[in-house]
Amino acid sequence: MSALRSLGNLLLALLAAALAVALCLAPVAGLGGVAIARADETMRSNLSDLTHGDAPGVTTVTDVHGTPMAWIFNQRRYEVPSEAISQYAKDALVSTEDRRFYDHEGVDMQGFARALVTNVLAGGVEQGASTINQQYVKNYLWLVDAQNEEQAQAATEQSIPRKLREMRMASDLDKTLSKDEILTRYLNLVSFGNHAFGIEAAAQTYYDKTAAELNPAEAALLVGLLQSVEALNPYTNPDGATHRRNVVLNNMAAEGYIAQTDADRWAGAPLGILERPKTLPEGCITAGDNGFMCDYALHYLADKGLPLEEIERGAYTITTTLDPAIQNAAISAVRSNVSPETAGVAEVLNIVKPGTDSRDIQAMVSSRYYGLDLDQSQTILPQPYSLVGNGAGSVFKIFTAAAALEQGYGLNTMLETPTRSVVYGMGDGGAANCPPGAYCVENAGVYAPRMTLEDALAQSPNTTFVELIQQTGVASVVDIAVRLGLRSYTDPDSFGDGRSIAQAAKDENMGAFTLGPTAVNALELSNVAATLASGGRWCEPNPIANVTDEHGRQVYIDRPACEQAIDPQIAAALAAGMSKDIIDGTAKDAAGRANWTAPIAAKTGTTESHQSSAFLGFSLGMAAAPYIFNDGTQTTPLCTRPVRQCAAGDLFGGNEAADTWFRAAYGVPGSTAGLPESSSVYQRGTKRAALDAVIGLNQATAKSQLEAQGFTVTVATVFGNGAPAGTVVSAAPADQNLSAGTLVTLNVSDGSGPISPTGAPTAPLSPCLLYTSPSPRDRQKSRMPSSA
């Protein structure tokens, strides 16, 4: 009775098999109904994806010289061509997984029927029937196509629709690819355990060799693992792995790929695997001190349309702009001044290469180690390239100076330097005993009562710049800070109350902005220096030199165009004004400690309560801004030598931050490249130049020209000394700062002739005589020295 039942089951199974094969291998036509439609959808072959798609691989992140510093992947796979795979591996696969591989057309009908009969008679699954083609399809849908857990389960579910689809696609695959191509794709795709995907990664993992170098026993072991990579792991189950290897060797001998004597000899050999599997560290977390740059590069690419998910799958080569020699110099400089183990305080440094069409980041470091262990002074927070700390302090005075230069001030313009400054409508608080509604600031040191803008940049009196920002306007200073490089100051909620820092500073008419009281992005601050070194031209800080895909094709990166942030002459003038900082300014001592003699432009900065400090410096070949700040859970004043948290701070930008810059600069080839040539126009100021420009003009033209530039003009007639009547001989401002609305007196010739040798004036010259303007050289000789 049981024999009859088995025979009946067999006949039914064969009938079902015939129907299934007919459905999956023949086009579905004329079979209406929802069920058939669903079956057709399930079976539909995505042949283009199978034959042209790329399996996930390993993305390599390198420094500018191509040396790897990190690998990014989900599946560690290295696709190799057929000739780079040992023939023994192909033979082992065919002899063990699909002996009729070269005879069938993707679906082995004989094997299918044989397995079906065996399983029915056994009352369970005793024999499989999947060909190499079918296994490839299943693994591809699981390892490549599946985008989530649900799709992964669908790719491996035990269901008739899934099996039919698999058979249909396997048949199509055989019509499209050669047998060798199918074997190559299969061996490049499947998992071999221990995080190795594909035969090349497997050969490296277990034997530290290439797939081309595998001998019969090694190939047999790897193919044997495919039965169950977990159960047959040779590191946890060497006996099981050895037994399975020997089964594969005997299969190879049975199919004639190797001699039986060779199979027996290899079967008696030890596994020969490495003492431990050779794996590959994954992610920026393994990049050590280069981790910050690696992480920034990935964020940068994500912003440009190449997300991390794609990078993890794409087998890209990402070449960064990081220069290892400059990076090492930066690390040494930072950690020589701020210990990685010091609680609550860190120093960050980015070194940016100036340029008018690109802005490469050559180094990005923190005094902290990159990592996850807080007990080991590690962090993965984006300290070098995000808004951190309590501000760059007086470094922000360069923005006020730049705004003043734009508005016509010159480096020689004289500015008041009161001991205490009280301004209204520009915030409140500040120095002690400040009246309600006023913002008060005092100078820490003793200064001359008046000094030039150039000297003010070097000596850094607070009161001078608070009064200067009152004259230039806070909005213009904020805007120029953003244009020069502090672009994150326009990010929504960067101020913390829903507003950007830039908007809050403008809304509150923040006089303290010139003293740098807000968190700063150290990368952007370094880029400000690079912008000034590059003729006032802003370019986005760039961590990427090149990206190619696994086929070596260039990947386009949509970078923003560079912008002219300020006039090149203003940038050069500001650089000239900042050059005195290391000569007789706040960075003089630091330059002396470093024995630094090359010209640079520099500005030190310290917040009012010494909670952070910075040093911005640049030459034509290097730009950087070391930044020291509280990075713990508690913000306190900071002390110097050594840098640490303390109750009463004494840290200044001319201390460790400046020391860091000079020490790092010795490792940067372009650091001694000098400064741009400065124009004399901005030494005196464009407003002063505007006054000089009307000398020699007639009264009406001169008056109109100055009024158009915002001056209030009055006229006085003076002794002509040979100038034609009605001709301007000088222009005298009432306010040496030449602010908007300044009263200017035009001194106009009365036509008197020059003094005769007897001391008597000569007869007046006719106003009808043609007056010839002096040459620029003669005009320069005739000018009186300016007190502005």
Across the structure, where does each feature detected by a protein language model lie?
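Short pre-catalytic segments that frame enzyme active sites
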Residues: 67-78, 201-205, 230-234, 308-314, ...
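A penicillin-recognizing enzyme superfamily signal
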Residues: 316, 320-342, 349-351, 364-367, ...
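N-terminal type II signal-anchor transmembrane helix
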Residues: 1-60
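Residue-level preference for non-acidic, small/hydrophobic
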Residues: 66, 93, 136, 182, ...
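Bacterial peptidoglycan biogenesis and beta-lactam-recognition machinery
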Residues: 95-108, 122-126, 173-179, 191-196, ...
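Peptidoglycan glycan-strand catalytic modules in the bacterial/periplasmic cell-wall system
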Residues: 55-58, 62-257, 369, 458-462, ...
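Extracytoplasmic/periplasmic proteins that interact with beta-lactams or build/remodel peptidoglycan
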Residues: 36, 48-58, 63, 127-135, ...
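Ligand-recognition elements built from short beta-strands and adjacent flexible loops
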Residues: 670-773, 777, 786-788
